Every structure is written in C-alpha cells, then in structure tokens.
Amino acid sequence: MRCLELNWEIMNKDSSNFLYKYWLKGCEFYNKKDYDKAIEYFSLSNKIFKENVPKCDYYGLREEAYKEILNNNIEEGIKKFDWFVEGILADGDYYNLSGELSTIASIFAKIGKLDITKNFLNSGGEWIYNDVIKDANSEDILKSVLTFDFSYEERKEILNREPHLRKLFEDNIYNFNSDFFDFMMMFFIGAGNWKRFLEVYEEFKNKIKSCQISNEIVNEIIKRFDKSMSDLLAIAHLLKENYEKCLYYVMLFKEYFDLDEFNEIEKNKINLIVDIAYNLKNGNVKKEEWLNRLNEIYKEIIKRPLPNTYKDAHNDDLLNEILDYYVLKEFIEKKL
C-alpha cells in the first residue's frame, strides 16, 4: 500500500540530510574513479530511503522538487529529487528510471548545474551496473542479444551453426535485460563519461567472447551490438579523441538506421560530429564555427525557459536533447 500524498515537511529531516550526505559522498568517490567505494555510499543512501519511506508514494516529490528549482532553492531541490530517485532504485524500476533521470538531469543542465547533472546520471548508471551488469551470466547476455538484436531467421541460422546454443532457448526466461544495459550506457554518455562507458562496454563484449562459440559468431554478435549502440559509441570515441573510430561508428549508425526517421536536431548533430571528427583527425580546429553551429542546432532548446511544471518538463521531448548539447559544447570548448 502507498499513502496518497507525501508531505516533505513532516518527513524526517535528519534522514533526508543523511541520505543527501551519503549520495554526495558517493558522487565524490565516483568522480575519483573509486567506483566500489562510491557504490557503498550510494547503497547507504538507498538503505536510508528504504528504512524511512516504506509505504509512501515518492512520486509526489517530483513537483515539489521542481518548484524548489524554479524558486532557486537548488540544494533543497536536489535533496527532493535525490529522495525521489532513491525510491525508483529501491523498487528496481529501471524503465521509469530511464525517463525520470533523463528529465532530472536535463533540468539541472538547463540551469547550468552540470556537476549535478553528471552526478545524477553517473550514480544512476553505476547503480544499474552493479545491480544488473556486473555479475551477469555470459550465457544470459548471449541469449538476450540473440533474441532482441537478431531476427528469428538470423537466430535460427546461428543456432544451426552452433547447435549447443539451442539449450539456451528451451525456456522463455530471460535473466538479463538488455534495455537496462542501454539505459546505463545512455546515462554515462549523457554525463560525458566516455571512460566508464567504454570500460563497461569492453567488459560486456568480453562476457560474450567468453561463451563457447566460434570467433566468427562472436564477431557477428558484437558487430550487431556495435551497430545498435553506434550513435553512443561515436560520441564516446569523439570525446576520447579517437576520431577514426568516431567516424567508423557514424558510418555504422547510418548503415543501421534511417536518418530520415530522426528529427532535424539529431540529423544536424550527427553531421556536426562528422565534421568535427574529420577536421580534428586532419589537425584542423574550427572552434568558433563548431560552437556557432552547435548553438544554431539547439537554439530552440537554449532560448526556451523551463516549463512551469515537472510534468510538462517530463513530457517535453526537446528538453532531453540538451544533454547532448552540453556534452558537445564542453568538448568543443576544450579545443584550442
């Protein structure tokens, strides 16, 4: 059962302050690349939530938190949003986490609090990694990838070549959810965290390579997954300054997806990434030109004020585009 309304004023302020304190401490360790220590503090933060709000509808905090942001009470807004996110994590509701965390991160990016944006995205991504990815069974991953990234006919052909894999499909139980993996990777890229993104992606590929299948099949599976993740991989390698790989993944993206199905912002973003990578590969820096193009692409998002309510912000598809804007802007501004 859930209570109908959550009143922040009657909640235990000590608990909310401790929760916020542990979350910030976790973010501090995370930014030092001490991921194990960070998750210890994130877990403490979530434990406090579970012990203090066992029956309440924490979704009620979204609008309260958003009002704090609009009234420039930033720290109070962070605390309430953090409490809300802890509730989603406690429920393991990663489908809702995907949309809600993207909205929250975009709100803080919109008001220029990029450190908070990164903290929310990184902590959410790392939580999914520890809960879903880190100890995932290699065969569970393989089964999920073959099911959701390959057609029935393609999968049938692979099983004919590797008949021992048929045992994986003797039931309809899936212990690995590839959607959660996608959410995690989107969080890392939204935070500009290309190092963690590539590190986890390599770990994921190694799990597939560890399965008892031929190298030929392994390469087919990894290339298919590379294609499905190609837009994120292109950004990751741009940020890493590996421009050849960035251009390669853009090529894969165009091969796998129909650009005409994307909005103008996405199409122009991809074209800008290609131009940046191609020029930097050849030693040409066009910082002002790229910044001008970037601002032109995202001008509608930049000039629009935040919506009046959290609900409106959550339903604003354009607002979520702002994460890519700041990731690319930060990268371009670091160029000479």
Swiss-Prot record:
Q: One Pfam family of this protein, by short name?
A: TPR_3
Q: List the InterPro entries hit by this protein, alphabetically.
A: TPR-3, TPR-like_helical_dom_sf
Name it: Uncharacterized protein MJ1348
Species of origin? Methanocaldococcus jannaschii (strain ATCC 43067 / DSM 2661 / JAL-1 / JCM 10045 / NBRC 100440) (Methanococcus jannaschii)
